Amino acid sequence: MSAKDPKVVADLKYTRNIGIMAHIDAGKTTTTERILYYTGKSHKIGEVHDGDATMDWMVQEQERGITITSAATMAFWKDHRINIIDTPGHVDFTIEVERSLRVLDGAIAVFDGVNGVEPQSETVWKQADKYKVPRICFVNKMDRVGADFVMSFGTIKEKLNANPIPVQVPIGMEDTFRGVVDLLENKAYMWDQSGMGDHFEITDVPNDMKEEVNRFRTEVIEKIVEFEDELLEKYLNGEEVTVPELKRALRKGTLELKAFPVFCGAAFKNKGVQPLLDGVIDYLPSPLEVPAIVGHDPERPDKEIICKTEFDAHAAALAFKIANDPFAGTLTYIRVYSGEVKVGEQLLNPRTQKKERIQKLVKMHANSREEINSLKAGDIGAVIGLKFTGTGDTLCESSHAVVLETITFPEPVISVAVEAKSSADQEKMLAGLAKLEKEDPSCRLRTDPETGQILLSGMGELHLEILVDRLLREHKIQANVGKPQVSYRETITVAAKAEHVYEREIAGETHFAKVSLSIEPISQADGIQFISKVAVSKEFTAPMLKAAESGFREAAEVGPLASCSMLGIKGTLNSVEVRPDSSSEMAFKAAASLAFRDAVKAASVELLEPIFKLEVTCPDDFVGNIVGDLNARRGKILAMNVKQGGGQVISAEAPLASLFGYATDVRSLSQGRASFSMEFLEYAIVPAKVKTDILHKMGRY
């Protein structure tokens, strides 16, 4: 069946793949719970603060009242199937947001009606911009003291440089909030104050709001008609513009990322969720309306392959998350981009060159599941029992191999040493750590080459705390966990070249390889890159090239200053010498590794440390204390702005090494009245004096 087939078009036209994203505590999970309740998936509304929210199904999530992993679920609304992913808002779990956005077609951005756009909202918004995800906005908590729709709307415009279009305005604010006015339909939606918000009445706009609503409505219509030339002409000619025409034009603007429709409500009080669901259908794209994904040929990376959203095309799917289920084993969440993935068939993973049999396919509802026989293009589900597939891998037909663009993962910035209490626990611990690393690519495992300790690295203190908690609980292990340490990195500042001849006799056989390579500094965000100017041939085979790259990358894991992983280096293989009788993969791996080490010695190595971006909100009386303290922590003050309603917002950057325990210190500096948020910004070169101190502490001087 092709995408022209009416059944396929109907199927996909009525599908939405969406995410719910926001700053921590803006009400994402509560909004999702309401959506599940109103779409009939959940017979009882789960509350985050009671620890029984459906989407928060890990023990750690229910205890902390925050979302850590992206739970995926399917719901139905007005003949449409909606696949929903609830993403975490805490900065330590940015990776979960990143990988969710990679496979979604649209998103609901939830904002706190009291605070408007907050730091993590900005981060998530930028991630959605990166993947060109159309969004609708939901200004939540309109019933809270201090709720201000106009202020929140303004922050979307100013802080996010977006073009928000209000499709609703609230009726009442704070404790008088009782409904919304739909500006396109010019009707009021009033919710019953009692009950679960199932029942609402659609009535005329309240008399005391008519004048204001008419003014707003005219402004909104004037903005919307600009998205369609014919409609603009019609409007300028003084003709009546209908509601369906306005919705069609606003949909066009939303899909082109020129507009972001704004809804409002109070999810906790069950108000405003049904019109938001209508907004998902009216303004967010179906899989047919997003550009076809482009992959490339694994054998020829410069050859592009377009994966069309068609059921009869060759199968291609992206694995975007791995989870371990205590009963089912490994669950691999996939988004199918073209063709159909069926139970019983074998698919190829081009990265590992291994074939995987699709034993079981399931549709997920948070942590319960329903077995299905196939997943078609445009759909999201999970495969049970894949052995060799990781996050960001492609699954495709071996006769039509394709590699889809993978997911980029941030560098971990903080680590702890983990040591099993007994030798019996040691094996269990290593198996448990390997599982965690497979599930969560933003956590890394490495053995310290000096001490032999196992180091678990992650994106922040909370992230590490939860990883360790899961390790101990899920795998029933007793372990000693060290204090969190900063994960330093190393880089080069000048280009260098080296060549190395490896010739050795092992077990009576000679192994020979000669490589010449050059290295140069690149952006730290680009990690370690390797390219070859030497073409694969009969003599210099593809496995030899792969072995040389492997040797290069492994050598970059241990820097010369402090044995830290290296970043920001591009390596180029310039030439090789092959002897047909004695050259081997092992020899090329060793030669490339040793050539890299020789080149690094001449490349002026520097130590890198993670820098964090901070935003501290505090009353005016304590600004001096906070700024003085940040300066003492090697911080850099970037801006100070007056906060609406009083107080100051201080924007700063500071090294992570100086921020351990900052939450406690900031409370005592402000008598408990300051709040702050921080997120990873970049790795930067450590100043010379500080570098000497760090290397002394590491025993490197």
UniProtKB/Swiss-Prot annotation:
The record, for CDD domains, names: EF-G, EFG_III, EFG_mtEFG_C, EFG_mtEFG_II
Q: Where does GTP bind?
A: 22-29, 86-90, 140-143
SUPFAM superfamilies, alphabetically?
Answer: EF-G C-terminal domain-like, P-loop containing nucleoside triphosphate hydrolases, Ribosomal protein S5 domain 2-like, Translation proteins
Q: What residue stretches are annotated with the tr-type G domain?
A: 13-288
- Cite a GO CC annotation: cytoplasm
Keyword Protein biosynthesis listed? The answer is yes
Cellular compartments annotated: Cytoplasm
Please explain the role this protein plays, according to its UniProt record. Answer: Catalyzes the GTP-dependent ribosomal translocation step during translation elongation. During this step, the ribosome changes from the pre-translocational (PRE) to the post-translocational (POST) state as the newly formed A-site-bound peptidyl-tRNA and P-site-bound deacylated tRNA move to the P and E sites, respectively. Catalyzes the coordinated movement of the two tRNA molecules, the mRNA and conformational changes in the ribosome.
Q: Give the record's family classification.
A: Belongs to the TRAFAC class translation factor GTPase superfamily. Classic translation factor GTPase family. EF-G/EF-2 subfamily.
What is this protein identified as? Elongation factor G 1
